[in-house]
Amino acid sequence: MVDKSQETTHFGFQTVAKEQKADMVAHVFHSVASKYDVMNDLMSFGIHRLWKRFTIDCSGVRRGQTVLDLAGGTGDLTAKFSRLVGETGKVVLADINESMLKMGREKLRNIGVIGNVEYVQANAEALPFPDNTFDCITISFGLRNVTDKDKALRSMYRVLKPGGRLLVLEFSKPIIEPLSKAYDAYSFHVLPRIGSLVANDADSYRYLAESIRMHPDQDTLKAMMQDAGFESVDYYNLTAGVVALHRGYKF
């Protein structure tokens, strides 16, 4: 019998007990929640908005559908999906982190996004929804923080309706070698400094850089989605592979 307490995983470059990672990730996002949107704009030079727009365009979401914005944070995707599904549809903004969920709720209500949005604190590995609930699931810059990614992908598959699709927007592996080296230098030297100056938290942004490097590359994540049951899985490299959008279907 396997001793669960001895199972390990990665927290950035650290090896930690699996049971500890969720709390460590929670601490990171409790710390950065209030500066999350500002830091996203600064870190990506605003390009994250284009990546998210492309995700929306690839989602195929239309009026009357039900969408799960998983690890939805401050609600960038939820705001757009809310308009697409209209009054007859529904968007569930789910996040494991209470601070991020609170920021998302406040932000969306302040811009008038109400009525067809629900907020749920949920763990991606054990989603609290019935089978075959959602037409579309998105997880944007969240999967790399999940302890058991395979379990989370199976959970997402379960709650998708037949014909539904999952879109995973996540940092990935640059496909141009000179860019990869420059990206490493930026991630490990510049990002922590920005985090220190703006959010007074260099360590959380050092974890961000490390977690990106430990995340599966494009083809590995594609295979993981297929192993979870998804079909017709493909991916798009964005900004030369700095970010990738994976899409898979449940048939």
Curated annotation (Swiss-Prot):
SUPFAM superfamilies: S-adenosyl-L-methionine-dependent methyltransferases. GO terms for biological process: aerobic respiration; menaquinone biosynthetic process; methylation; ubiquinone biosynthetic process. Its main location: cytoplasm. Pfam families: Ubie_methyltran. It is found in: Cytoplasm. InterPro entries: SAM-dependent_MTases_sf, UbiE/COQ5_MeTrFase, UbiE/COQ5_MeTrFase_CS. Its EC number is 2.1.1.163, 2.1.1.201. Belongs to the class I-like SAM-binding methyltransferase superfamily. MenG/UbiE family. Component of the Ubi complex metabolon, which regroups five ubiquinone biosynthesis proteins (UbiE, UbiF, UbiG, UbiH and UbiI) and two accessory factors (UbiK and the lipid-binding protein UbiJ). Methyltransferase required for the conversion of demethylmenaquinol (DMKH2) to menaquinol (MKH2) and the conversion of 2-polyprenyl-6-methoxy-1,4-benzoquinol (DDMQH2) to 2-polyprenyl-3-methyl-6-methoxy-1,4-benzoquinol (DMQH2). In vitro, can use demethylphylloquinol, an intermediate in the biosynthesis of phylloquinone (vitamin K1) in plants and cyanobacteria. PANTHER family: 2-METHOXY-6-POLYPRENYL-1,4-BENZOQUINOL METHYLASE, MITOCHONDRIAL (PTHR43591:SF24), METHYLTRANSFERASE (PTHR43591). This is Ubiquinone/menaquinone biosynthesis C-methyltransferase UbiE.
